[in-house]
């Protein structure tokens, strides 16, 4: 960096060589400028040494002239004696104190005597210390920069030097170190001053673009340009050229052009090395050396103000940085949730380390990932993992267990569209409605570079759910980092920041309520690579630690298997949602769809079904998205039976209530939610799903069917699987109330689980929706079923819940089509309006009625499937 000749020729000093040997051996050092010894002045003061960066190398004669000139500047020294004595002593001390570089060689006694009658007639000869002498002196200096007289005598004897030479060598060596520190400090101050000048120039430039009159507020007419403004323009042009050169160097380092308009990083980070990214030889990609310094250089606007993403504001002002120019002290910290300060460099280092780990874990096979013998899930070899990677989120809290899964597949979505959905919290929730209960962006560390999402880092808060009241919600606060590694190749990684935000807490999550489960995300995310025809190959990795004791024992095998919130569920949900979006955007109708519905009506009906499913999931998991008031757990009658029921023969039902007042899309009054989960050992999830979505067998269990089959009026496909659809059902009952009622039903299924959600709607409202009307004001209360595998493998031993509840390890599952330990976990949830008055009080009779209805429905399903039931 040029400083415009600020230091050229400034100051004075003694120029010496910190080197040894004329042969250029290992002991040769670059020449340095040493400050002159203090020069006496008449007033007894001393001149401060100067600083010069521009002196050229001088030969011995020139050094002698300089020494003589310096000595002649004195005026008698500190003792008595004249100019001659002072000159002699100055020359002698300087000759003896040459930093191990110049030494007297073979000089006679007369030559060394300062009182010689003609000392200037004979030219003194000098030589350098040998490399061995310098090496020995340097070694001692590292151990003891201030040796005492005894140590100096020992060194002089061992190195064949005079004690005075050793003494002066150490003095000069200490002076060199001090001078280096001073230079570094001055350079740092100059860099800060340079940044301030840049900021001032930017302010002046903005003011010159739109000059305003201070008195009238109108446009000001520029007069004659002053001399000061001309200097500012010249300085501004010079700074711009310098910035362009820096951007060009950064572009060469990163392999992509860097705009000079981007705000520069803070001065302390300008010297950091860049992040090395490249395409790997195996078709994947790899990362070079990573660290916080790499992040600063590779993301130019990383330390700028907290600009928001397109499409929505940033959620919490508490985590927002003050907007401003990068490099200000305030831009280096974000406020923590508890009011503390977080160094952004720590967050950047965490994000980069997580990205490095995700890329490697997604690429590596054996011995890191061990294939299962039955062709199922891969297993992470934790011994190999701990050898290969350092922990990025601290030690695992006591009582937590780990889950690690990996899955790959093809999705009908481009890499850019998927990345945009993941980096936008509302779109992310819509993409995974059954997994993400709620999500928000707390802070934007970086909005990306070059107008893309590459380099974007966000601090996010999310609630992850398993559709059952027996599994608390996982609340996580994490960093999401997106990076483009090559053309059409992206990676998005999540990593918990609990250890940074709350270092005094061992557990993850931000709530101590029993409705939440402690959880920490280790590097988790996906690798997306574009393929032909709008498809992408997606590799999903989930690595988490959670408090298993918070979940009921019925669901612990499912959680341990990684099927509850593992990579397979994320990828399967993504594939199903992408198929739905592709059909929604298509102009052609699937073969199974009814042609009577217009395209606008189809979209309106699908939007209504999506709202119904979202409300169902929020009611099952008691997410904070809906304000439910939890009641005491009820015991329904007749939930068990068949030899496989719970220990007391009753179902444990979670009851919640809320008052709906003027909410669009909901009937006013008191809404009661009843939810329970049971296990059907030996009954496959697909069999349960096919039975529940069959309108011909609806009368077996649905009280709305009045014991009869239903007729499908309309059908809208949502995917390639015939089980992914939205249907409009009509009861075959003859009563007036039934004739005015229809059933809106949405069914979803994939390899991770299935969902059947339905709600009664009136005929007039559905006619409006099917003709393209707004569905936001259609009132409905959803009910339905969430079906998941139970997580038991063939031949596995029964869980403690089975043994404790009276289940027999050898009991057969009638009609289950599988072994005893392969079954389903079914969650049943009803939302019922128990009173039309929002101010009415909830009665015990209403709660008992809904609880008994839930238990009766489970009993009917059990009888129809000829299955045994294990209740919590």
UniProtKB/Swiss-Prot annotation:
Gene name linked to the record: ROC6
Residue runs in coiled coils: 176-248
Record-level Gene Ontology MF annotations: DNA binding; DNA-binding transcription factor activity, RNA polymerase II-specific; lipid binding
InterPro entries (UniProt xref): GLABRA2/ANL2/PDF2/ATML1-like (IPR042160), HD (IPR001356), Homeobox_CS (IPR017970), Homeodomain-like_sf (IPR009057), START-like_dom_sf (IPR023393), START_lipid-bd_dom (IPR002913)
Compartments where located: Nucleus
GO (cellular component) term, any one: nucleus
Span list, region Disordered: 28-53, 67-130, 792-818
Lineage: Eukaryota, Viridiplantae, Streptophyta, Embryophyta, Tracheophyta
Known role: Probable transcription factor.
Pfam families from the UniProt entry: Homeodomain, START
Source organism, top-level taxon: Eukaryota
DNA-binding region of this protein: 122-181
Chain intervals with Gly residues compositional bias: 74-85
Record's compositionally biased regions (Basic and acidic residues): 86-99
Basic residues bias: start-end ranges: 119-130
UniProt keyword annotation of Nucleus present: yes
Residues covered by the START domain: 340-583
Keywords: Coiled coil, DNA-binding, Homeobox, Nucleus, Transcription, Transcription regulation
Protein family membership: Belongs to the HD-ZIP homeobox family. Class IV subfamily.
Protein name per Swiss-Prot or TrEMBL: Homeobox-leucine zipper protein ROC6
Broad class of the protein's primary localization: nucleus
Gene3D superfamilies: 3.30.530.20, Homeodomain-like (1.10.10.60)
